Regions:
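ATP-dependent adenylate-handling active sites, centered on carboxylate activation for C-N bond formation
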Residues: 1-182, 197-209
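Conserved S-adenosyl-L-methionine
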Residues: 184-195
Length: 211
Protein backbone atom coordinates (compact mmCIF):
# COMPACT_ATOMS: atom_id res chain seq x y z
CA UNK A 1 0.00 0.00 0.00
CA UNK A 2 2.77 2.44 0.89
CA UNK A 3 4.49 1.86 -2.45
CA UNK A 4 1.32 2.79 -4.32
CA UNK A 5 0.75 5.96 -2.32
CA UNK A 6 2.36 9.34 -2.90
CA UNK A 7 1.91 10.17 0.79
CA UNK A 8 3.19 8.34 3.87
CA UNK A 9 0.66 5.92 5.31
CA UNK A 10 -0.01 6.40 9.02
CA UNK A 11 0.91 3.43 11.20
CA UNK A 12 0.53 3.01 14.95
CA UNK A 13 1.95 0.72 17.62
CA UNK A 14 1.25 0.54 21.35
CA UNK A 15 3.19 -0.93 24.26
CA UNK A 16 3.57 -0.84 28.03
CA UNK A 17 6.25 1.54 29.23
CA UNK A 18 7.76 -1.19 31.41
CA UNK A 19 8.26 -3.80 28.65
CA UNK A 20 7.07 -2.75 25.18
CA UNK A 21 8.04 -6.03 23.54
CA UNK A 22 6.93 -5.30 19.98
CA UNK A 23 7.49 -1.55 19.63
CA UNK A 24 11.01 -1.96 18.31
CA UNK A 25 9.85 -4.45 15.67
CA UNK A 26 6.98 -2.21 14.60
CA UNK A 27 9.42 0.69 14.31
CA UNK A 28 11.76 -1.47 12.21
CA UNK A 29 8.95 -2.32 9.79
CA UNK A 30 7.72 1.28 9.67
CA UNK A 31 11.21 2.55 8.84
CA UNK A 32 11.60 -0.15 6.18
CA UNK A 33 8.28 0.75 4.54
CA UNK A 34 8.62 4.49 5.01
CA UNK A 35 5.36 5.03 6.89
CA UNK A 36 4.55 7.92 9.19
CA UNK A 37 4.79 5.98 12.43
CA UNK A 38 3.44 6.80 15.88
CA UNK A 39 4.24 4.95 19.10
CA UNK A 40 1.76 5.08 21.95
CA UNK A 41 3.04 4.20 25.41
CA UNK A 42 0.61 3.15 28.12
CA UNK A 43 1.24 2.57 31.81
CA UNK A 44 -0.44 0.99 34.80
CA UNK A 45 -2.54 4.10 35.42
CA UNK A 46 -3.90 3.93 31.87
CA UNK A 47 -5.09 0.38 32.52
CA UNK A 48 -6.79 1.39 35.75
CA UNK A 49 -8.40 4.39 34.07
CA UNK A 50 -9.81 2.46 31.11
CA UNK A 51 -10.73 -0.88 32.67
CA UNK A 52 -14.35 -0.01 33.44
CA UNK A 53 -14.79 1.48 29.96
CA UNK A 54 -13.50 -1.69 28.31
CA UNK A 55 -15.77 -3.89 30.42
CA UNK A 56 -18.73 -1.64 29.56
CA UNK A 57 -18.14 -1.72 25.81
CA UNK A 58 -17.28 -5.43 25.63
CA UNK A 59 -20.03 -6.44 28.06
CA UNK A 60 -17.88 -9.10 29.70
CA UNK A 61 -15.73 -9.71 32.76
CA UNK A 62 -13.75 -12.45 31.01
CA UNK A 63 -10.11 -11.73 31.86
CA UNK A 64 -8.75 -13.15 28.61
CA UNK A 65 -11.04 -10.99 26.50
CA UNK A 66 -10.34 -7.89 28.57
CA UNK A 67 -6.60 -8.50 28.47
CA UNK A 68 -6.71 -8.83 24.69
CA UNK A 69 -8.75 -5.64 24.35
CA UNK A 70 -7.01 -3.08 26.57
CA UNK A 71 -4.28 -2.08 24.14
CA UNK A 72 -6.57 -1.83 21.13
CA UNK A 73 -9.10 0.22 23.08
CA UNK A 74 -6.48 2.69 24.33
CA UNK A 75 -4.84 2.92 20.91
CA UNK A 76 -8.15 3.63 19.19
CA UNK A 77 -8.89 6.30 21.77
CA UNK A 78 -5.53 7.91 21.03
CA UNK A 79 -6.19 7.87 17.28
CA UNK A 80 -9.63 9.42 17.76
CA UNK A 81 -8.36 12.19 20.04
CA UNK A 82 -5.14 13.05 18.22
CA UNK A 83 -5.77 12.54 14.50
CA UNK A 84 -8.46 13.08 11.88
CA UNK A 85 -8.34 9.41 10.87
CA UNK A 86 -11.74 7.74 10.57
CA UNK A 87 -10.87 4.32 9.11
CA UNK A 88 -8.18 1.92 10.34
CA UNK A 89 -6.94 -1.44 9.11
CA UNK A 90 -6.29 -4.35 11.47
CA UNK A 91 -4.85 -7.85 11.14
CA UNK A 92 -7.58 -9.97 12.69
CA UNK A 93 -8.55 -13.34 11.13
CA UNK A 94 -5.06 -14.34 9.92
CA UNK A 95 -4.77 -16.72 12.88
CA UNK A 96 -8.03 -18.44 12.06
CA UNK A 97 -7.11 -18.85 8.39
CA UNK A 98 -3.47 -19.85 8.64
CA UNK A 99 -3.06 -21.25 12.12
CA UNK A 100 -1.75 -20.33 15.51
CA UNK A 101 -1.69 -21.97 18.92
CA UNK A 102 -4.93 -23.92 18.53
CA UNK A 103 -4.00 -25.36 15.14
CA UNK A 104 -0.21 -25.58 15.43
CA UNK A 105 -0.62 -28.84 17.31
CA UNK A 106 -3.36 -30.33 15.17
CA UNK A 107 -2.67 -34.06 14.77
CA UNK A 108 -3.46 -34.04 11.05
CA UNK A 109 -4.67 -31.75 8.22
CA UNK A 110 -8.29 -32.82 8.68
CA UNK A 111 -8.24 -31.75 12.32
CA UNK A 112 -6.57 -28.47 11.33
CA UNK A 113 -9.32 -27.72 8.79
CA UNK A 114 -12.10 -28.60 11.21
CA UNK A 115 -10.71 -26.33 13.93
CA UNK A 116 -10.06 -23.48 11.49
CA UNK A 117 -13.59 -23.78 10.09
CA UNK A 118 -15.07 -23.75 13.58
CA UNK A 119 -13.17 -20.60 14.51
CA UNK A 120 -14.10 -18.83 11.29
CA UNK A 121 -17.78 -19.51 11.98
CA UNK A 122 -17.41 -18.17 15.54
CA UNK A 123 -15.47 -15.02 14.61
CA UNK A 124 -18.43 -12.75 15.23
CA UNK A 125 -18.56 -13.90 18.86
CA UNK A 126 -14.92 -13.34 19.77
CA UNK A 127 -11.98 -11.58 18.11
CA UNK A 128 -13.88 -9.67 15.44
CA UNK A 129 -16.55 -8.63 17.95
CA UNK A 130 -13.84 -7.48 20.37
CA UNK A 131 -12.05 -5.47 17.71
CA UNK A 132 -15.27 -3.98 16.36
CA UNK A 133 -16.36 -2.75 19.77
CA UNK A 134 -12.96 -1.30 20.67
CA UNK A 135 -12.84 0.52 17.33
CA UNK A 136 -16.44 1.73 17.14
CA UNK A 137 -16.34 2.97 20.74
CA UNK A 138 -14.15 5.79 19.45
CA UNK A 139 -16.13 6.67 16.32
CA UNK A 140 -13.72 4.80 14.05
CA UNK A 141 -14.39 2.24 11.36
CA UNK A 142 -12.33 -0.92 11.03
CA UNK A 143 -11.25 -2.68 7.86
CA UNK A 144 -10.06 -6.28 8.11
CA UNK A 145 -8.35 -7.36 4.86
CA UNK A 146 -7.93 -10.96 6.00
CA UNK A 147 -11.71 -11.16 6.46
CA UNK A 148 -12.49 -10.30 2.84
CA UNK A 149 -15.03 -12.93 1.80
CA UNK A 150 -13.22 -13.90 -1.40
CA UNK A 151 -9.91 -14.15 0.44
CA UNK A 152 -11.45 -16.28 3.18
CA UNK A 153 -13.02 -18.60 0.61
CA UNK A 154 -9.73 -18.95 -1.24
CA UNK A 155 -7.70 -19.49 1.94
CA UNK A 156 -10.07 -22.15 3.23
CA UNK A 157 -9.90 -23.95 -0.13
CA UNK A 158 -6.13 -24.44 0.21
CA UNK A 159 -5.03 -27.96 1.12
CA UNK A 160 -4.75 -27.81 4.94
CA UNK A 161 -1.66 -30.00 4.75
CA UNK A 162 0.15 -26.93 3.42
CA UNK A 163 -0.80 -25.02 6.57
CA UNK A 164 0.50 -27.56 9.06
CA UNK A 165 3.23 -26.27 11.35
CA UNK A 166 5.94 -28.63 10.11
CA UNK A 167 8.62 -25.93 10.14
CA UNK A 168 8.08 -24.94 13.79
CA UNK A 169 6.81 -21.56 12.62
CA UNK A 170 3.23 -20.50 13.17
CA UNK A 171 1.34 -19.46 10.04
CA UNK A 172 4.21 -20.72 7.88
CA UNK A 173 2.20 -20.65 4.64
CA UNK A 174 1.40 -16.95 5.11
CA UNK A 175 5.04 -16.17 5.86
CA UNK A 176 6.19 -18.26 2.89
CA UNK A 177 3.91 -16.30 0.56
CA UNK A 178 6.08 -13.22 1.18
CA UNK A 179 9.42 -15.02 1.38
CA UNK A 180 10.51 -14.23 -2.18
CA UNK A 181 9.40 -10.59 -2.00
CA UNK A 182 10.87 -7.50 -0.38
CA UNK A 183 7.66 -6.40 1.31
CA UNK A 184 9.06 -7.14 4.78
CA UNK A 185 12.54 -7.61 6.25
CA UNK A 186 13.35 -11.32 6.37
CA UNK A 187 14.10 -11.32 10.11
CA UNK A 188 10.71 -9.75 10.78
CA UNK A 189 8.90 -12.13 8.46
CA UNK A 190 10.17 -15.18 10.32
CA UNK A 191 10.33 -13.92 13.89
CA UNK A 192 8.21 -15.60 16.53
CA UNK A 193 4.70 -14.22 16.69
CA UNK A 194 3.33 -12.72 19.88
CA UNK A 195 -0.37 -12.23 20.47
CA UNK A 196 -1.37 -8.56 20.42
CA UNK A 197 -2.15 -8.66 24.13
CA UNK A 198 1.24 -10.24 24.86
CA UNK A 199 3.17 -7.98 22.55
CA UNK A 200 2.13 -4.83 24.37
CA UNK A 201 3.80 -6.10 27.53
CA UNK A 202 3.57 -9.11 29.84
CA UNK A 203 3.40 -6.76 32.84
CA UNK A 204 -0.12 -5.79 31.75
CA UNK A 205 -1.35 -9.19 32.91
CA UNK A 206 0.06 -8.63 36.38
CA UNK A 207 -1.49 -5.17 36.58
CA UNK A 208 -4.91 -6.51 35.60
CA UNK A 209 -4.66 -9.29 38.17
CA UNK A 210 -4.02 -6.67 40.83
CA UNK A 211 -7.41 -5.18 40.05
Amino acid sequence: GQRLSNQPIRTFAIGMESDPIDLKYAKQVADYLGTEHTEVIMNKEDLYQHLKEVIYHLETFDITTIRASMAMYILCKYIHQNTDIKVIMTGEVSDELFGYKYTDFAPNPKAFQEEASKRIKELYMYDVLRADRCISAHALEGRVPFADVDFVDYSMSIDPAKKMNVYNKGKYLLRHAFEETDYLPHDILFREKAAFSDAVGHSMVDYLKDL
